[in-house]
UniProtKB/Swiss-Prot annotation:
Lineage: Eukaryota, Metazoa, Chordata, Craniata, Vertebrata
Location of this chain's protein in the cell: Nucleus
Signal peptide: none
Gene Ontology annotations of biological process type: meiotic chromosome condensation; mitotic sister chromatid separation
GO cellular component term of the entry, any: nucleus
Key word Lipid biosynthesis present: no
Keyword vocabulary terms for this entry: DNA condensation, Nucleus
Name of a matching Pfam family: CNDH2_C
UniProt biased composition (Polar residues): 96-108
Family assignment from sequence similarity: Belongs to the CND2 H2 (condensin-2 subunit 2) family.
Protein name: Condensin-2 complex subunit H2
Amino acid sequence: MDSVETRYAHLLQPLRDLTKNWDIDLASQLGEYLEELDQMTISFDGGKTMMNFAEAALLIQGSTCIYGRKVELLHTLVFQTLDYISNKNKKRDKQGSSSDGNQEQAPSGSEGDGCEFDEIEQDENVNTHNITMKDPTEPVRIIRLPPESLIPAESHEKQKYPLLSLKGELLGSCKDFRINTFTMDEAGLMRLGSNTHFLKGVAEVQRDFSVHLPEPLQIEGEAAAANGGYDEEVDGGAEVLPPLEDHGMEVESDEWVERHEAPSEGRMLRPRPAVQPVSEEPKQLKETVDPWKLHDPYATFGEDKPLKAGKCYKVPAGLDESGKRKRKGPSKLQDFGTWFNKAFETADRKLKNGPTFPDLNYIFVSKMDQRLKVQRQMLRKRGVFVSDEELKKTYLEPENVEDQVEVIRHPDADGDDYSDEEHDNLADDLEPAEHLDDQEQIFQDLHMSRMSYEDLVKKSVDLFLVNSQKYAQETALSRRVKDWEDSINPHLAAQEISPAFDIHEYGDRIVHALSNVGVKKSFAFVVRGKENTEACRYMLAALQLANDYTVEVDKVDGLDCSVDTMELTLLTTQRAHERLKTYNATAATDIP
């Protein structure tokens, strides 16, 4: 054991330096280990079962290669993600610099990010990428972008737009000359440089001013002597131009202009007076209104006015008798009770023996079983038998306003009542009050023989209408559903009655049918006289036995000829699941 531990010590102990992994020759060591496993024999059950460790080692080697590929793919995806983030930040910085011009701006990035990626610094000698995270508290270094005209163009950009002379000679590229760098605006005009972009707003302002005809030129001396330096009348109709704003352009000083002006004594344009900029009045901020101020019970608004008593005037008697047409007064408010009953009237009808309010019918129906049970007991004591359907009809009978209370007629012809029913009220008084109406109704239904012929006809017609509604509401779809239920219910009942499927029990039946080892019989012989469901179960059990090498499956060659030619050959009578129950693995010390 000591030699084995010293031999594989570099594999058992964790490696602190990852570079030492490449010094290990896994291929040679794995080959030696496979040779040892090939010579090693581990058997169970007296040599019947053999353990093949060579296949296990090859499987481990293949899984190691797959794992190495996955690690390599993950390494590549990480660096692709970092490159994508870096390029995205660079594009965002370029877009921000082109829109803001020469103004100073902060580096791009969302405010919510706690940290940002710096550019990936890569050493020439080391093949590792170092990524440093920025501290948000450090001051940001603002890098000024050079003008576009000072950035040298690349060689392929120069060849893209060549500059040719009239003779067809190649003079250079459009990028070589400052005047040839232009941009296209919305109107399709060429704008030379960025200064024209700044003058775009000024040109739009100049269009709003009125344009006048040019005035004749005057000699500088005469104009100055006549009007003291400028003509007021002519200047009154002159065009007033707004001052040009400085958008980052360099304005030449007056001294430099005077030094380069050529002396001329000819006609000169009169000087235009400077236009004073109109001072803008500061906008007054609107007072913010506090929406909760009016809800403050302790706040005071204005001054408290003293209470003044009003004066009462008496209307003269003849004022209302004038001939003026009186206006129609406002409509009277509807009674709340009437409006409430119409608005919240339910579709449920009031039951004759039910609760006062139809909304409570569901409670009355839920307690129907208890009521029927009590009434059935009371009727048994009286010796009267009534079906449950008749009792339910008495409870669920709707109330009809036009019905009049019918007096129960006694069977005596003279109308004299000599029965003991007058004492029944004494027993009813001892019962709860909620059952009084129900008992009276049931008592009336029990004496249907005493009812008139007209009442019996009405009751029969009502029952016929209720039963006919069921057939009127029956549709083709409901009939199809009913037919399907009638056809499927016998099959479901048969499945419930059939015994549970035990694959081992059916396997024992097949082994018992084959009787001895080496006997070969057809599958049709085994399942002869069985139902289709039983044949399917025998088929599953036969496939399980073939998988356990208990039986061997044969068939005739050919597609058409092999139909219903399945044959089973018994290989062993010992079942696989029984062998697993009695299986005992040998100890490690017993291995040679």
